[in-house]
Amino acid sequence: MPAPTLANRRVAIFEDDQRNRERLSGLVKLCGGVGVPVNPPAPSLNRLMAYYTDQRINLVICDHHLSQRGDYAPYFGAQAVAESYRHGIGGILVTAYERDDAELSLRLYRRQIPALIRSPGLDRANLQTALLQAEAEVQKHQLTRERVPHRTIMTVLRVDERNTSKIVKVMMSQWDSEQEVGFPLDLIPAKLRIAAKPGNLLIAQVNIDAARQEDLFFDEFELPNPDALKKAKTILGRP
């Protein structure tokens, strides 16, 4: 059986650097698809679907920082991928700043980003794999093991201030008992945010099979059942 390709797929390319747009378009062509470079200014978020319909777009590639070279777009690439996801268009994010942005501008939208590729390691093979993965997740609801969420309990370590945002630092033994992970306080529903205090336990849907911290997403937060919480604190020796 021949390996799957991007044949007949039209792939929109959001990238504020013209040379990178052309390079990505060339890689898409090598994968069997048709690259559609989005020239500046890029359409606004609420005009994306109109643009996709007009250009017959099937998939999307986005750089994360889209305003480093002028006023290409007033939003992050992560926002564009997430908006596309919500409307049934699969997309991938390409960035060299995945670790710097992981806990804030990436984590806010990570649930709706099927694949994230480091730009220094981008090549035809991993681009094709990521785009086909995005298509399968969005259109067929086929998630890779690393993208399947699981009900996960976590301990709040602290809440850090970062510019105008607050980052909740947690530890999840179901993922890595020695590595702390952060996410924006805004991900937690407003009525539950008061529980984001050091020592408290939270529960969320998390893709704990992800190998990299920047691939983790957090969704559907809840508080532990009071009886279960009391039992857990007794086991852990907490007051």
Language-model regions, residue ranges each:
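Short amphipathic alpha-helical segments and helix-helix/interface helices
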Residues: 25, 78-82, 105-106
